[in-house]
Every structure is written in C-alpha cells, then in structure tokens.
C-alpha cells in the first residue's frame, strides 16, 4: 500500500509546492519546460567544471608536495595553457548564453491574436479578475474576486494557504493573454508551473502570455512584498478542456457576474 501511494505521488504531476521540495514543479507550458531544460543544461556544465577543477586541485596537492618537490619550479608564462583557459570557458559560455537569450526574448513575446484575455488586478489582500472577452446580459464584463480560504477552514484535499474561493478557469491548449495591474501597491502574479511571474504595478498594465498544455490545477502566490497579508494572496489556475470551459463560462461566470 505504501509503495502504491509512493508511486502515485511520484508519477503524478507536481503542480503545487510540496514539503522539502528541491526541484521544479512539473511544467505546464512550453515556457516552463524551456526554463527547466535550460536549468538542466547549465547544471550539466557546472558538474563538468566542478569535476575538472576538483581533479586539478587534487592532482596539484598530490604531486606538488613540498616533500616531493623541495625546490619549487618557477613558471611565469605558459602560452598553451593560457590559450586553453581562455578559449574553453568562452565556448562553455556560448553554449549557455545562446539558449538563455532565446528563452529570455521568448518570454517578452506577446501573442498578437490571443483566444482569451484575462485581466488580473491585485488588491490588499485579494485579487479580482476580469474576462473582457465575454459580456453578461447587462453588457458587463465577467468579473469576480478571489480570496484565500482561511487556514482553519480548508476542505479535505485542499492545500493550506494555497486555495481560493474562486479559481481562474482557462481552457487548455489555448493561447491566453494575462493583463496584470494593481489597485493599490506593488503585487505580482506568479504561477511556477506556467513559468510566469509578472509584476502588478499601480497605474500600469503589464502583460504576459501562457499556453497551458495539459488540464490540471496550478497554484501560485504573490511574489512581491505588499504588506501584512502578503502571504495570503494565492493564485489558483484551473485548466480544463475547451468544452468544459464553455460550460463553466455560461453556467458559473455569467450568473456570478449577474449577481454582482
């Protein structure tokens, strides 16, 4: 039974922070997958450098001991080794820099014609969302507030201090534009599984794009210190199928907006 549970939690996607977690959450977007791949590539080069430098250090300590070489050699110049130690690190830096720059510039790209635009507004200390592509019967955009569920009132299976009363529902495999701003102080809209962290600045509109590739529930938090309850501003993005998303919009968001 224990082995079965271990296999389940090991193979299941990790879309929320876990106790003693050291690695990344599982990627839900191509952007996050690129970040993870870049991290692994850089880590590979770091291991090579660590092994090489450690080998040189151990070799120097072993061979150049004062008992073995009481009279040290005086070497003031070595053209070959100087060329190697200049060219070799430059090649490594090129292998690291080229994919990192490509990923960095792709983060700034915004989809020209997104299928859905969602506006996320930060408040002290909750969030409000606006689906500007849909209008209710009274010609109002679909809006709702999202508050954290108190830590003393979670339901079975909910994450402590990460669950909200109203989730952001998005369709999977669809280009989505997120417009981020703030109504009071600096906030941030960050969801690690999607590889997105966008600052919410009062009086300014920042935007980012996401393409969630699989259905699931993704958790995030405010990543900008914004006051006393900074830790109580979670973000929950629920990615569903396009068919389910359409029914959610018609059955939940529109009635909710009408009541507001």
Curated annotation (Swiss-Prot):
It catalyses: 4 Fe(II)-[cytochrome c] + O2 + 8 H(+)(in) = 4 Fe(III)-[cytochrome c] + 2 H2O + 4 H(+)(out). SUPFAM superfamilies: Cupredoxins, Cytochrome c oxidase subunit II-like, transmembrane region. Its cofactor is Cu cation. GO terms for molecular function: copper ion binding; cytochrome-c oxidase activity. Binds a dinuclear copper A center per subunit. It is found in: Mitochondrion inner membrane. Keywords: Copper, Electron transport, Magnesium, Membrane, Metal-binding, Mitochondrion, Mitochondrion inner membrane, Respiratory chain, Translocase, Transmembrane, Transmembrane helix, Transport. It is a multi-pass membrane protein. PROSITE patterns: COX2 (PS00078), COX2_CUA (PS50857), COX2_TM (PS50999). GO terms for biological process: ATP synthesis coupled electron transport. Mg(2+) binds at residue 224. Signal peptide: none annotated. Cu cation A1 binds at residues 187, 222, 226, 233. Residues 1-41, 105-260 are mitochondrial intermembrane. Residues 59-82 are mitochondrial matrix. Its EC number is 7.1.1.9. Its main location: mitochondrion. Cu cation A2 binds at residues 222, 224, 226, 230. It holds the Pfam family COX2. InterPro entries: CcO_II, CcO_II-like_C, CcO_II_C, Copper_CuA, Cupredoxin, Cyt_c_oxidase_su2, Cyt_c_oxidase_su2_TM_dom, Cyt_c_oxidase_su2_TM_sf. It comes from the Eukaryota. Belongs to the cytochrome c oxidase subunit 2 family. PANTHER family: CYTOCHROME C OXIDASE SUBUNIT 2, CYTOCHROME C OXIDASE, SUBUNIT II. Component of the cytochrome c oxidase, the last enzyme in the mitochondrial electron transport chain which drives oxidative phosphorylation. The respiratory chain contains 3 multisubunit complexes succinate dehydrogenase (complex II, CII), ubiquinol-cytochrome c oxidoreductase (cytochrome b-c1 complex, complex III, CIII) and cytochrome c oxidase (complex IV, CIV), that cooperate to transfer electrons derived from NADH and succinate to molecular oxygen, creating an electrochemical gradient over the inner membrane that drives transmembrane transport and the ATP synthase. This is Cytochrome c oxidase subunit 2.
């Amino acid at each position: 039974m224990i082995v079965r549970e271990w296999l389940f939690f090991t193979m299941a996607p990790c879309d929320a922070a876990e106790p003693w977690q050291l690695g990344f959450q599982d990627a839900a977007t191509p952007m996050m997958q690129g970040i993870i791949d870049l991290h692994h590539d850089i880590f590979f080069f770091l291991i090579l450098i660590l092994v090489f430098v450690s080998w040189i250090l151990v070799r120097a300590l072993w061979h150049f001991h004062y008992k073995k070489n009481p009279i040290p050699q005086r070497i003031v110049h070595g053209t070959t080794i100087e060329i190697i130690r200049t060219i070799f690190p430059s090649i490594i830096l090129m292998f690291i820099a080229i994919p990192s720059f490509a990923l960095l510039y792709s983060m700034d790209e915004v989809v020209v014609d997104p299928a859905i635009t969602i506006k996320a507004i930060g408040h002290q200390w909750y969030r409000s969302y606006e689906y500007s592509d849909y209008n209710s019967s009274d010609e109002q955009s679909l809006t709702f507030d999202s508050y954290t569920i108190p830590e003393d009132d979670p339901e079975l299976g909910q994450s402590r201090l990460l669950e909200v009363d109203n989730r952001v529902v998005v369709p999977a495999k669809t280009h989505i534009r997120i417009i981020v701003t703030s109504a009071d102080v600096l906030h941030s809209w960050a969801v690690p599984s999607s590889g997105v962290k966008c600052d919410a600045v009062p009086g300014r509109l920042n935007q980012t794009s996401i393409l969630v590739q699989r259905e699931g529930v993704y958790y995030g938090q405010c990543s900008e210190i914004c006051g006393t309850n900074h830790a109580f501003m979670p973000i929950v993005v629920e990615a569903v199928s396009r068919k389910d998303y359409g029914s959610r919009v018609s059955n939940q968001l529109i009635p909710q907006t009408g009541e507001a």
